[in-house]
């Protein structure tokens, strides 16, 4: 390993850790800083800016913001809340189910924020430590990105894998089955072996004595806007249209032989159509869209993806020959190592889509996968869930939100940073999803 590689690696890791330390948008800013240092000081060719991923995120978030302003998100949250409150004893299973499918529908895990107060309240009412359902609910909202038809990560992966002979419907089937089953397996383990008794928590008893724990309260809800339900149906119809169109242009289905609109363009345009219909049908004040929390968090995600994905692509592209040689030797003999690489890469790159974009094309080249020689393509499909390790560093917004909203103190970040409430459930969920993927993918594909 020569000195230039060590310097480049130091810049890569230094930029990422500086961004993580500064927090928020800074991970995107320092990603751009890292690209500048690699290019201007160390002579590396700048990588490709992930325009496709960013545009998809922008389009989806624009539609989600319209849905939120119309009251559609509140409508979905109240429906999910009724489900949780009617079945409080099953909170450890229902909480991740709700956040998982909200993410599947919306294409962003930030929808989990709206469910956190409800999860905490229901858990407290059943004397269950909120950390149990909260931890797997947050993890489920992250891993569901790898199965959502409107997420940038899935759109990118399907665009890469379909030319290799894997049909879009089969990809969705594998990812939906394996990721949801993995979340439920972790929920089962938490239910069976977790320390669930809230009354025995020393942190809870201390906070209770100090008056820091809010009493169980269902609370009053205001009236939903008139167009709330309409906006949900419009959005749901748009998501179904995206899936149907993506299936129709899939070579395996072949309903549309020569599509004028590619999958990326379809999801962007369909999301804009959804937003337009919601604005018109629900008579929204478009000036308020910029104030929506989903819009702000989504645009922040675009900045973060811009920086870290560009930085990651710059580094990987500059060492593509070494990456190909190493990946060919290791992944060819030990397929599960791809999942390990994706796990650690996503931990640093902070985005499922950015990780897939940085790693997967190089692995395809390394393994020599082509439409004629695609026997190893199942490795990529099975390992995809491993790009969801955003929970390892306790700085992700939904993770921090869960810690802040749990007034019992059971959901926490430990003294040693990594010993937090989400690490074990998250690692188990990815291990189960990848393991199931290696079983299911060869059977389905």
Regions found by a protein language model. Give the residues of each.
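Helix-loop-helix module between adjacent transmembrane segments
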Residues: 61-65, 95-111, 136-148, 175-186, ...
